[in-house]
Amino acid sequence: MTSVKRLAEICGGTLTGPWQGVEVTSAAIGSRDVQPGGLFCAVPGQKVHGATFAADSNAVAVLTDAAGQRIIEDAPTPLPCIVVDDVREWMGPVSAEIYGHPARQLKTIGITGTSGKTTTSYLVEKALLDSGLKVGLIGTTGTRINGKPIPTSLTTPEAPTLQALLARMVAEGATHLVMEVSSHALQLGRVRGLHFDVAAFTNLSQDHLDFHPTMEDYFQAKALLFERAEDGQQPGTAVICCEDEWGERMRDIAAQFSSTVALYPQTKNDSAERPEANTNPAWAITSAEVSASGRQHIGVEITGAESSRKLNYSIGMAGAFNQANSLVALACIEAVTGETLTSESPAVQALADVQVPGRMQLVEAGQDFLAMVDYAHKPGAVQAVLSSLHDYLPDPQARIGIVLGAGGNRDHEKRPIMGRIAAELADAVFVTDDNPRDEEPSTIREAIYAGAREGVLKKKKQQQDKETVCEIVPDRAEAIAAAVSWAQSGDAVVIAGKGHEKGQLVAGVMHPFDDVEELANALAQRAQAHSEREGRQSESSEQR
């Protein structure tokens, strides 16, 4: 237990109400989540202040601001309050104190970037587990402790939930933590009070401009993982993917605070200038080959101040961007373990078998074309997936179809951009619903479709158009079926946007929906229809 007096000392807060002798055993940001004996972190809401619900919670004390304190003071039974200017700024350090600073007992890796966080974290988790270590994972697809799933919601949980999870991981024997760190989490202070031994940056492309007013603001939010000057929590080692100007800028920022490992994933047409060997190592992909089965065989050169070495490994996932993800993963593993990796290391060998739900996930039902589900829901990710498919398909005449939507109540500007990219790189675009949330679905579809039509016109001007199909199919299951019906032998179909998700959020209601299941159903129905046609043709032939 921790006294509220001690917590007030940590955050420099003012104590009000009957605080003497009060101790807390847990913390929560949701009033309904407060356990008996817990601290309620009451923050201002969009409509009402969280402190309004303090009296109905199990809280024995409240961390809040001046506005929240006034609400609690006027309640029939006032609770002890720790009053601070910014509750979110102090939730992390206070929660860490309550739970005994569990992160100090873990080797921690934090991964940020627009795309690739989930795949990279999966790769790191598998490699560490195969090396005989106990590992906790927190990210978009959920939380796991030593491979066992633990229900969570946000990519990066709120600080009280996060610290409770870390304490549970330590209690269950975990020694290492692999964690996705979103820009929201950094901006809202969810990881304050948590030191990362290794912090990694994958890439930056347009997304979340509903939350960040500009790309520069988005970049600066990501950079907080490496600066974090407000609480002296800079990472021990920074791993930076330097494939463009964003990566180069992040490398320069990180180098001011941490030992920095620069990564260069592009094997050709490099836009990033590779520095000469210095005291900081640089990892560069020197070769990448795709086998007939789709497995990628990758060669890496690692250079330092006085020497260089080579590393060869395989991954079972398609896409040039997964080459980059694997490079980030290996650099993180070497940094956190202190082991000099070789091609024979268990951690390196482990990457060959990793499959990530909803990330370039192949769905096979005996069809003669490629069918996959991917989480791509932002312009950069859509471009990366479609470009990778062009490189992946053996027949240059093979066609690519994409089912595409966009989330409601999110960045509006990216919708036509996604549509345009899809039409420029694919041969068929089936515009449909993603998670409309509280928006009118047709408005979202029309924005994507407008961009797609722009892409088609651009291809026609360049005389590149092969009669691109561009259709609006509102029902997502029907759109998936339409794409499957369109595909011919040797083609590829990708269902983009929802990936691992198991539901579709429409007007505040979550409806069961799984892209992988729907794609499998559509493939089965196509196979059945084909079988029935063959049966009728055979029957007709016999009658003649």
Regions found by a protein language model. Give the residues of each.
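Short glycine-rich anion-binding loops that position phosphate/pyrophosphate groups of nucleotides
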Residues: 45-47, 183-184, 206-207, 244-245, ...
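Short acidic-hydrophobic, aromatic-tinged amphipathic segments that line or gate anion-handling sites
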Residues: 81-86, 471-474, 479
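Short, flexible loop segments at boundaries between secondary-structure elements
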Residues: 209, 511-544
